[in-house]
Curated annotation (Swiss-Prot):
Molecular function (Gene Ontology), one example: proton-transporting ATP synthase activity, rotational mechanism
Organism per entry: Pyropia yezoensis (Susabi-nori)
Keywords: ATP synthesis, CF(0), Chloroplast, Hydrogen ion transport, Ion transport, Membrane, Plastid, Thylakoid, Transmembrane, Transmembrane helix, Transport
Keyword set includes rRNA processing: no
Membrane topology term: Multi-pass membrane protein
Gene name in the database record: atpI
Parts of the chain that traverse the membrane: 35-55, 94-114, 133-153, 202-222, 224-244
Keyword ATP-binding included in the entry's annotation: no
One Pfam family this sequence matches: ATP-synt_A
Assembly and binders: F-type ATPases have 2 components, CF(1) - the catalytic core - and CF(0) - the membrane proton channel. CF(1) has five subunits: alpha(3), beta(3), gamma(1), delta(1), epsilon(1). CF(0) has four main subunits: a, b, b' and c.
Compartment annotation: Plastid, Chloroplast thylakoid membrane
Protein name: ATP synthase subunit a, chloroplastic
Amino acid sequence: MYQNSLIDFNPYNSLSAVEVGKHLYWKIGSLQLHGQVFIVSWLVIATLLTLSFLGTRNLQRIPEKFQNFMEFILEFLQDIAKNQIGEHEYRPWVPYIATLFLFILGCNWAGALIPWKLIHLPEGELAAPTNDINTTVALSLLTSLAYFYAGLSKKGLGYFARYIQPTPVLLPINILEDFTKPLSLSFRLFGNVLADELVVSVFTLLIPILIPLPVMILGLFASSIQALIFSTLSAAYIGEAMEGHGEE
């Protein structure tokens, strides 16, 4: 009763309420999927595909306006891959690194900009997909598969010789490193996105409208940095797996 009266007194409280650990479950056989994560992820993917189509449907030799912006984004993402993977090996990995960056950025910004709490769900609430640990772990495991594939495609079975370099004594540590990389990637992204949403929610609860705006702007900046860090580290891990096999 007290909680309902508080929400009636201050309607912003309903927007600032945070539901942690509650999910809208979709059941497919014996599997339980987090429905709200898929809904927002599909919206982000649809938005990215739409922007890509609009930016490439009428390409001009001399780019103007939106095409110029899209080419700037592409060059920025190419530079990330080139700097981390190497000038001779980076091109095949640009689509993967670019997809990682744009998807994470879109998910983070979707959580920071769109008032999802206005959309009522039977259970849980819509939010940034990256504030769900399952999403960040899945992205991290994709990066793990990517750098294993990169190493094996360049070195063959000789890739596994890295585990006993520079000395076989380091074998356990080198194996452990392959587990810590995806763990650090996933928990860093998950923790920062969740913390940002919690901070904005708390400030909105305490002082509505005015004070949360600078915090939201800071959250957008932090969300962009997290997307950059994740994609840069992913490219660095791929480059490390292929190290020593570029052309001189």
